[in-house]
Amino acid sequence: MKKSATILMIISIIFFAFAIGFCGARLAKDCGRPGLTILHVNDTHSHFEPVLLEEGNLLGGVVEGAAFVDSVRRKDGAENVLLVHAGDFSQGSSYFTELNGDLEIDVLNATGYDVVTLGNHEFDNGIEELARRLSSLNCPVVCANYDFSTFELGKYITPYTILEKAGKKIGVIGVLTDLRSVVDRSIVDRIPFFDAYEVTNKWADYLRNTEKCDLVICLTHIGYGGDRKLVSNTRNVDLVIGGHSHTFLDKMEYEKNLDGEDVPIVQAGCWGEYFGQIKVK
């Protein structure tokens, strides 16, 4: 991991009504200094309304989520906050089936996401329909292990993107799960794909050593187990933000990469009930 961007031990899965977090003792003295805040969510699945809990309380919802994001941007400075979605923002409620997935794009735009990756359910209505929807999206879409260049869809998807936040140059690579078992073969068989480990190593090396990024993030939709395997087969990745398995991680998990370095992995459950928050100094 590049030492100029150390992942601070302040990892929280956050209920919208309040933010909880802690600074590890080793770096507690740095908590008052401005730095990069990463907010991440995954597998929202067209859930726009709060979930009713057994005790009668409400959890999640896009209005509450947007309010939480805005509160963090006000507190930390919008220029210091990176907001990402790890895929499957589509499918899972009548909003998607009745409105053809347009509302999901409107919500992503209104909330001001900086970058998203694709999940398998983004393809439920086909390649051409996904292209139509993404043409209205205001942020980069990253996916490195599929080749969409022969489709209209290819205009809206790149293997990686580079952003500047909190004075740091940040490279974000997208990795999508094997679609052959989760998407109709009439769709999947039209899309060439690459080995996920090879393309991750290729672009991570490029972002680290050619673009001189301070931080290299893999934004994935391959599941928690897939994230661990990805880390163990790659290098030059500083952080993995995952989705697909709906795994609720209330703390960072770590896996060693090819160089024997611990790489943190995070994921924030599903349905927009929680956001993850990461502080980088």
Task: Say what each PLM segment does.
Residues 1-13:
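N-terminal Sec-pathway targeting helices
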Residues 14-25:
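Hydrophobic alpha-helical membrane-insertion segments, chiefly the h-region
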Residues 24-281:
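Acidic, metal/ion-coordinating pockets
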